[in-house]
Swiss-Prot record:
Organism from which the protein derives: Aspergillus fumigatus (strain ATCC MYA-4609 / CBS 101355 / FGSC A1100 / Af293)
Keyword Nuclease assigned: no
Full protein name: RNA polymerase II holoenzyme cyclin-like subunit
Keywords: Activator, Cyclin, Nucleus, Repressor, Transcription, Transcription regulation
Entry similarity comment: Belongs to the cyclin family. Cyclin C subfamily.
InterPro entries on file: Cyclin-like_dom, Cyclin-like_sf, Cyclin/Ssn8, Cyclin_N
Domain called Cyclin N-terminal: residue spans: 53-142
Gene Ontology CC entries for this record: mediator complex; nucleus
Record-level Gene Ontology MF annotations: cyclin-dependent protein serine/threonine kinase regulator activity
Subunit structure: Component of the srb8-11 complex, a regulatory module of the Mediator complex.
Main location (coarse class): nucleus
Keyword rRNA-binding among UniProt keywords: no
Origin organism lineage: Eukaryota, Fungi, Dikarya, Ascomycota, Pezizomycotina
Length: 302
């Protein structure tokens, strides 16, 4: 997907303000207070963690690339800016987003194979009728106005690696931070290059002495960011800090000379700190039970 981000539908149609996202969700709440009362759901970020983990399980069964999983997560976010989650079967939406993302990221899977693997994971929520996924795919494409190309931060990370002399460990940790940002609203709020710069800063500043980073960065970053995050944010806001290690100083200098949205980078970092704090409350069992009760009670699995 090498198209120009600046001319993309992602930039023109799928970036929101925090206020706009809050307004959309409030409209959903006001539009169906009964459903919100009857079927309480966890914090959106906890749901995002659950959805991400389910996508990873599905992807592993088909050896799917990370970028396809990331695209699927963005599709899910976009879909739920147009639809109240309590009126949908999230497992069908998740499976359909995965199926569509694989096609768009040029690693397509046969529809029957996807349905079969999804049924093996969530037999009580996915029917063997492949036409259900086909119908949901049509709805997903329609709600996104056929705007299916997604630009990700991974590309910017790869481009900046030589310029910023990033080590393989720093790149791996930054990659994991990018994975984690899909668990927040950040893909709907900021450009991919802003996310990539945030991930690089976090990786360079908080990188442990050694580590093997796969999937999420939460285990190695949560405590460090909570304890030291504000100092780094102050240095970034100041742009002239004196005393940081040479590599961090070089990064701050590069940032000051670039045209990157510093305020956006800081806000993205704060959002990541907040994610890692709420992650401590995550319970896969709770998410599964609450979603399952909702889907079954409303017959959304039919």
């Amino acid at each position: 997907m090498a198209a120009n981000y600046w001319a993309s539908t992602q930039r023109r149609h799928w970036l929101f303000t925090r206020e706009k996202l809050a307004e959309i969700r409030e409209i959903f709440r006001e539009g169906d207070k009964v459903a919100h009362s009857q079927f309480p759901l966890p914090d959106q970020r906890l749901l995002n963690i659950y959805f991400s983990q389910q996508l990873i399980k599905l992807g592993k069964r088909m050896s799917t690339r990370q970028q396809a999983l990331a695209t699927a997560q963005v599709y899910i976010k976009r879909f739920y800016t147009k639809n109240e989650i309590r009126h949908t079967n999230p497992y069908l939406v998740l499976t359909t987003a995965f199926y569509l993302a694989c096609k768009m990221e040029e690693c397509p899977q046969h529809i029957r194979f996807v349905v079969g693997e999804a049924r093996s994971l969530w037999p009580e929520f996915i029917t063997p009728d492949v036409s259900k996924l086909g119908e949901c795919e049509f709805s997903l494409i329609s709600e996104m106005n056929s705007q299916l190309i997604v630009h990700h931060p991974y590309r910017t990370l790869s481009e900046l690696q030589p310029e910023l002399s990033l080590t393989s460990d720093e790149v791996a940790l930054a990659w994991s931070v990018i994975n984690d940002h899909y668990l927040t609203d950040l893909p709907l709020l900021y450009a991919p290059h802003v996310i990539a710069v945030m991930a690089i800063i976090v990786a360079v500043v908080f990188k442990p002495n050694s580590g093997n980073f796969h999937g999420s960065a939460a285990p190695v970053l949560a405590g460090a960011m909570r304890d030291g995050g504000m100092n780094v944010l102050a240095a970034l806001g100041d742009r002239t800090g004196s005393g940081p290690p040479l590599k961090i100083q070089k990064l701050i200098n590069w940032l000051a000379e670039s045209e990157v949205d510093i305020k956006g980078v800081i806000e993205c970092t704060q959002e990541l700190v907040s994610l890692y704090e709420v992650w401590e409350q995550y319970s896969e069992k709770t998410c599964k039970e609450l979603l399952g009760r909702m889907v079954k009670a409303k017959n959304l699995d039919k």
